[in-house]
Amino acid sequence: MAKEEIKIIAQNKKAYHDYFIEETYEAGIVLSGTEVKSIRMGKVNLKDSFARVENNEVYLYNMHISPYEKGNIFNKDPLRTRKLLLNRHEINKLIGYVTRKGYTLIPTKLYLKRGLVKVELAVARGKKLYDKREDIARRDAKSELEKHFKEKQLGI
């Protein structure tokens, strides 16, 4: 079978810095026509967005989709709440995670899959400051090792 083509439109890189990602889910999203056109043009921001479960439905908050230039009266509010489309089983699992202390739902990616806009929703646990410092130290040590190894190979 042919591999499904996925075009990533937006990523929330800050989420990987601020949270431990436990599990990810793929969700559809309810949008209007002008929002889809704006997303296809890449005018979307996931930076401060989060999801919440209300009345056994999942909603996405603070995802900024810039108004479509040619949308006129059909443009919606850029920061409006958007409903996510998940199976009942997945929603029940998310409810179980979110009721535990310290867990939250964060969108990590927004992409097109077979012409449909999808959101990768992550169950995340917040990092403490020392966890962030530890990650930075680990990354620096790795780059230092690679630099040292490269110098050794070149004979410097």
Swiss-Prot record:
Question: Which positions, given as ranges, span the membrane?
Answer: none
Location comes to: Cytoplasm
Q: Which residues form a coiled coil?
A: none
Disulfide cysteine pairs (residue numbers): none
What does the entry give for GO biological process? trans-translation
Keywords in alphabetical order: Cytoplasm, RNA-binding
Recorded GO cellular component terms are:
cytosol
Q: What is its main location?
A: cytoplasm
MF-aspect GO terms: RNA binding
Family note: Belongs to the SmpB family.
Functionally, this protein is described as follows: Required for rescue of stalled ribosomes mediated by trans-translation. Binds to transfer-messenger RNA (tmRNA), required for stable association of tmRNA with ribosomes. tmRNA and SmpB together mimic tRNA shape, replacing the anticodon stem-loop with SmpB. tmRNA is encoded by the ssrA gene; the 2 termini fold to resemble tRNA(Ala) and it encodes a 'tag peptide', a short internal open reading frame. During trans-translation Ala-aminoacylated tmRNA acts like a tRNA, entering the A-site of stalled ribosomes, displacing the stalled mRNA.
Q: What is this protein called?
A: SsrA-binding protein
Species assigned in the record: Thermoanaerobacter pseudethanolicus (strain ATCC 33223 / 39E) (Clostridium thermohydrosulfuricum)
